[in-house]
Every structure is written in C-alpha cells, then in structure tokens.
Amino acid sequence: MGGLSLPHLIVLALVVLILFGRGRISEMMGDFGKGIKSFKQGMNDEDSKPVTPPPAQIPPASLQQTPPPAQPAPQPTSTDQAQ
C-alpha cells in the first residue's frame, strides 16, 4: 500500500512523455549528463590543487605586551588608623 507498482510507473511515464514530448526529455537528459560531467571535472580540479597552509603570522614586537609590574599595596597613613 502506498508503493508504486509497475502499472503505476507505466502510466506515470506515459503522462510525462505526453507532457514533455520525446525531444524535450532527451534534451533534459543531455543537460543533466553535462551537469554531472562538469561537476565531476570541478571536483577533480579541486582535488588536483595542492593544499598549502597559510603562512604563520608572527605578531610584531611592538604589539606584544608584557604585564605591568605588580605594585605594592598602599601603606595606611596615620589619618587612616585614627578612625
């Protein structure tokens, strides 16, 4: 149930043949074949290109930052202790 049997496929093929005609179907199949051929050529061209990693970028010395030296905690003054 729900599947296409042989008689259904034959009727479907006849309807498609009537709608598009024999010439149009063969033209579409030729275009389909050309598309597959160009796709395969494109895939082969992509595979034949050597893959080179991009050169590593070394940051300039002026952009490298060193952490600031640690500053000692401020010493409490005599006015801070009086309160």
Swiss-Prot record:
<dbReference type="Pfam" id="PF02416">
    <property type="entry name" value="TatA_B_E"/>
</dbReference>
<dbReference type="InterPro" id="IPR003369">
    <property type="entry name" value="TatA/B/E"/>
</dbReference>
<keyword id="KW-0813">Transport</keyword>
<protein>
    <recommendedName>
        <fullName>Sec-independent protein translocase protein TatA</fullName>
    </recommendedName>
</protein>
<feature type="compositionally biased region" description="Pro residues">
    <location>
        <begin position="66"/>
        <end position="75"/>
    </location>
</feature>
<keyword id="KW-1133">Transmembrane helix</keyword>
<comment type="subunit">
    <text>The Tat system comprises two distinct complexes: a TatABC complex, containing multiple copies of TatA, TatB and TatC subunits, and a separate TatA complex, containing only TatA subunits. Substrates initially bind to the TatABC complex, which probably triggers association of the separate TatA complex to form the active translocon.</text>
</comment>
<dbReference type="GO" id="GO:0033281">
    <property type="term" value="C:TAT protein transport complex"/>
</dbReference>
<keyword id="KW-0472">Membrane</keyword>
<comment type="similarity">
    <text>Belongs to the TatA/E family.</text>
</comment>
<keyword id="KW-0653">Protein transport</keyword>
<dbReference type="GO" id="GO:0043953">
    <property type="term" value="P:protein transport by the Tat complex"/>
</dbReference>
<keyword id="KW-0812">Transmembrane</keyword>
<feature type="transmembrane region" description="Helical">
    <location>
        <begin position="1"/>
        <end position="21"/>
    </location>
</feature>
<keyword id="KW-1003">Cell membrane</keyword>
<keyword id="KW-0997">Cell inner membrane</keyword>
<feature type="region of interest" description="Disordered">
    <location>
        <begin position="34"/>
        <end position="83"/>
    </location>
</feature>
<dbReference type="GO" id="GO:0008320">
    <property type="term" value="F:protein transmembrane transporter activity"/>
</dbReference>
<comment type="function">
    <text>Part of the twin-arginine translocation (Tat) system that transports large folded proteins containing a characteristic twin-arginine motif in their signal peptide across membranes. TatA could form the protein-conducting channel of the Tat system.</text>
</comment>
<keyword id="KW-0811">Translocation</keyword>
<dbReference type="InterPro" id="IPR006312">
    <property type="entry name" value="TatA/E"/>
</dbReference>
